[in-house]
Structures are given as structure tokens and as C-alpha cells.
Amino acid sequence: MSTEPKPSPLTVADEARADELLGRLRDDLVAADFTVAALESLWGEDAAAALHRGERVPARRVLDARRREHGASAGLATLAELFVLGVAVPRGELSEALARLGVDGAIELGLVGDAGAAEGAGDGGDSGVATSVRARLDLRPYAFSDAYGSAEWWIISDLGELALGHALGEQHVLGVGGASMTLSGLMLPTPARRVLDLGTGCGIPAMHASRFADRIVATDISERALEIARLNLVLNGIDGVELRLGSLFEPVAGERFDRIVSNPPFVITPRIEGVPEYDYRDGGMVGDALVEAVIREAHDHLEPGGIAQLLGNWEYREGAGGDADGLERVGDWAAALEHWVIEREVQHVTEYAETWIRDGGTKPGTAEFDRLYDAWLDDFAARGVERVGFGYVLLRRADAAASARSTAVAAGAGRLARLERLHGPLGANEAGLGAHLAECLAEHDRQAGLDDTALAAARFTTAGDVTEERHYWPGDDDPTAMLLRQGGGFGRAISLDTGLAALVGASDGELSVGAIVAALAQLLEVDETALAAELLPAVRTLVDDGMLRFAD
């Protein structure tokens, strides 16, 4: 177990008092213009980029120069020094920056603590009298765009490695991270009556779900995480979220939801003494068993037609089918549900171990890093694991409409069951992938309910982000390769032959697929039935991928 000190306690026991203080804090943050854009303007693009890499020196130098020039920091700079850079600031300057909350209010909330006499930048007073304060929690702005527009929140979490100066504690509550932003971007923006956020952490998934859901139940195994999640909900004025303590689906036994979203603690961690068990990423199971458990149990907690979206890892084991092993295992776990699993990355076990040891704040080149590295590799070797996949999982419980789709065409043909490896760069998705996923699901359901005769009668248009590429050898009139490229979504590139290229090019919403196929058969001097048998499945695929859309 970790020997790091426990995180600072959250000191406000009375919720009404905490709500009052958080309201004052909100007013102060607005007054200081404590926003992403203002911070980047304060210290510049280079320093902002360095902060994203975990380096604060460039930003600190900018603020140090400002202090030398002006003698004291303005409100925005004070908050930036304190909460973003993790350095102590004079109590008097923080009092000005938090005029409504006050320093005592910030201490009562657990945001800051007394850093001791004369620690941090001086305020011009006697060194024996001057006092400074230091952040006890991380607080920073978070800006995003989704299908409903752009918005900005403030996110409270535990201090990160940069501010702590040492490895994280096991009870650490993570703030905005790559995984939480990925999941938030994947969420379907379609309205939902009741949503479950499984493993909410500091509350970011639940907050995003509030953009499209009437009611949300957010659970976590960490009581501290739920306390911080409540702070974030109140600070940002978000209602309709119920917080429950417990592991996985235990807090919602017997309940069903229209939507489940989850960034579960899926990181594969050795189950041996001395390896830190971080609440925010370690579910306490062996290997990828936690992801399997979430996928298998989701069925019982989804309403008919309900959808679950989660992130996860899966193991590739030697002698178990090579590339078919990891992703196919996920397909087996999801067999009771319609599913769309997209693998985005595969790491060798050495890369995986390095990533997550470093994530906890243990520095490479130290004896502790090497000890943990051995533990990870021993654990993988014991199960014959060679690589680890990471990706997105979308699950859907069948409803009456799904049954109708299955009976409208060949048995099972209308069922969503996709396992994909899409390891390349994504397309441009300013509002996240969620809107693209929602469109693909809707179009899939529509085409899956049509037999080939009905599909041939349908009219399509090419999606607005799709372009065609043709490659030529110098001097040749005929292309050597043709590609259909998706600008948004997953940035797919589909190889085209002459027939499919011509069909896509003619799909302007005026002619049916059948009419286009008939004209092409005459032009290419081929059998119309054979050409239709070749092109209609390709049309279904392009519809599923979001590259062709129904014209009406």
C-alpha cells in the first residue's frame, strides 16, 4: 500500500454552508475572468503548451516577471499561480482575488491552507509576519464544445504531481484528463430520460451528461470522489444529479437506465503487495476482468433500446489467436447486446507498464520505478499477455424496433455487431465524436430495416465531409488508386473501384441506388444483377460509416 500522506480533508460538513461558499467562489472566478482563454493570454501559447506537457517553468517565469514589474499579482495571476502552477501566494493578494469568498472561506472549503510565514512570494511586509497560502485542491477552468454549443466550467480535483512534487496517493481524485475528455466527446448527444454515470470520479461525465439528460445517477467507490463531484456540481450550477457510493452496479441494483456512460477504473494493475492501488484507475480485479464485468452486467441495467458507452483495455495473450484474441474477446463479452467496439490503440506490455507507472508520478530511472516495472512485467508474463488494446465500447439492448429490423431482412442481418481496429488519426470533430456516432447509429438502423429491394429504391447523398482522391502515375489517363476519404468522424479512407466510385459520385439525392446501378451496368457493359450484388453491401457499409446518408 502507498505510504503517501492522505489528501487534505474536505472540511465543510454542512451542505448549505458549502453551497453558500461555492456561490461566493463562483462570483469571484467570474470577476477574475478565470477562464481557459484568459489564462492562455496571460502567459502565452508557449507556456500554455508547456503546461500541457506537465512543465510549469515557462508560465512561472512569465508571472514572476509580471510581479517584478507591478509589485503584486492581479486577481487572475494570483489564482493562476495558486491553483494552476501550485505555488504559494501572499494571503493579502488572495484576499483581493477572492473578494467575496475570502481567504477564510477558501480555507473552510478545503481549497487552500496556510503555507507558513514568508513562504512563496513576498508581499512587502516583515518576513516574520507575512503569511502565504498554498492550494490544497486543484481548481482550474475547463472549456469544451459539444452538439449543444461551447461551454466552460471550473473543475475541482486533488492536486496533481506538479503541485505535490511527489507520486500521487492512492485516494487521489483525478481532474480533467485524457480519458474523461475522450468519454465526454463520445457521448451521444441525443436526449435521455435517465442516465447512469458509472465511476464518476470528480463528476465530469455526469456534468457532460447533464447537457442531454433529465436525471443522472452518478456512482463511485470513493467517498472522497463523490464529495469533490458534489463541489463541482454546485460550483457550476448543475442540478438533477444524484450521487451514490458503491462499486460498479451495486448502488443501482435492480434499476435500469436509458443511457450508461463509464470511464471505469480499467487500468491493468499487478495484484501484489507494494503496488499502489489508485482509486481513480484500479478496479481491484485481475487483468481486464473489470472491463468484462462492466460489459456483461450492462445488459441488466439498460432499458430496451438503451445504450452504454465506456472506455476499456483488453489483453492480447500469446497462443490465443494473435490479432483476433483481444478484440474478439470483447465481442464475446458483449454477445448478449448489440455492440460496436472500436480499438484505437495497442501497446506492447512494456509500453503499457511505463505509461501507468509514470501516470502515478513515479519517475523513470529510480529504484521504485524499476521495482514496479518488474511487478507489471511479471504479472503480464504469468497470464501470457503480450499486448494491451485500448478503445471505445458502445452497447445497445435490443428493443421492438431491433426485432422488426431483424425480421425485415435475413435473420440477424439487421443486428449491430461491429468490431473494428481504427488506429489512425481521427477526423476533425470540433463537437466531439458523439454526434457522428449518433448519426451512424440512426442511419444503420434505417438501412438495416430494408431488404435489398427496398435499399435499391432508396436515394442517398454523400456526407458533406467526404472527398474523393484519385492517384495517377505521371502521364497516365486512368487512376491507379481511388479513395473515399472522411474529413470528420473516424477519418476513414475507403478504397474504391470504378463501379463504387461512380455510384457515390452519382448519389446526389435525385436518383435511387437501383437507377444508378442500372445505368452503370449499361455503361460498364456488365450484368445488372451481379453489379447490384456487389454494390448494395458496399452501400450499407458506407451508410454505417457515415459516408452516405439517406436523402429523405
Say what each PLM segment does:
Residues 2-78, 133-140, 163, 400-505, ...:
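Acidic, low-complexity/disordered tracts enriched in E/D and polar residues
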Residues 75-120, 126-137, 184, 196, ...:
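Long, charge-rich, low-complexity alpha-helical segments
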Residues 116-119, 127-195, 200-202, 208:
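SAM-dependent Rossmann-like transferase core, predominantly class I methyltransferases
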Residues 169, 177-262, 268:
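Conserved SAM/SAH cofactor-binding pocket of Class I
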Residues 250, 267, 284, 313-318, ...:
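Short "lid" loop at the C-terminus of a central beta-strand within the Rossmann-like core
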Residues 349-441:
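Flexible, glycine-/basic-rich loop-and-beta segments that form/coincide
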